[in-house]
Amino acid sequence: MNRNGVITCALGGLLLSQAATHQAMAADLSVQVNQFFQQQYPDKESQVKVVIKTPQNQWPQCDMPEITLPANARPWGNISLSVRCDGVRRFIQTQVQVSGHYAVAARQLAAGEKMTLQDIKMKQGRLDTLPPGALLEPNFAQGAVSLRQINAGQPLTRNMLRRLWIIKAGQDVQVLALGEGFNVNSNGKAMNNAAIQDNVRVRMASGQIVSGTVADDGTVHILL
């Protein structure tokens, strides 16, 4: 083989090596981005799929990229993800598809109706296609009043509902401390407004401040 042939083979081998390295780093980045979003949803019932929309030849290349979500970024949908490699920050465009549970109306509700737990049903489906403010658990809706007509099966959102304070700041409340095989009743004064299933802080007669959950009957439950 002449000298030119040797140089051509060497250059070809170098280009193949660089291409293989780039593909390996790209594959690693894809895996790391998917793992990053999986960690945002520790619930085992949530399923996450990430599609990187930025062309692969524009992906940052390094062994240990620092991946972060921009401030106030949505948890799913189209997200511009910050990736820092060797001190240089770049943004890659991703589409995050998340499937999990969300709350829907179990029946048709008229405007002004107070919702009970029986009016709420949990459904499995794509979360990233839901309207803004969709409820992923029933607590917010329980005891709230519908601001407009809600159809059966319609996803519940925060702007559809007005929560009713069952406890108001300064109100005397009954506190029920629940332990294994026993419970203790006492009284205190609420330090904040709270609806059913909300967390409320209570100042006890001794001056001690405790936190508990508001039950349907307005008592504050503390698990010991």
UniProtKB/Swiss-Prot annotation:
Highest taxon above the source species: Bacteria
Subcellular location: Periplasm
Annotated GO CC locations: periplasmic space
GO BP: any one term: bacterial-type flagellum assembly
Keyword rRNA processing: no
Signal peptide coordinates: 1-26
Keyword line: Bacterial flagellum biogenesis, Periplasm, Signal
Functional description taken from the UniProt entry: Involved in the assembly process of the P-ring formation. It may associate with FlgF on the rod constituting a structure essential for the P-ring assembly or may act as a modulator protein for the P-ring assembly.
Protein family according to the UniProt entry: Belongs to the FlgA family.
Annotated protein name in UniProt: Flagella basal body P-ring formation protein FlgA
Organism: Yersinia enterocolitica
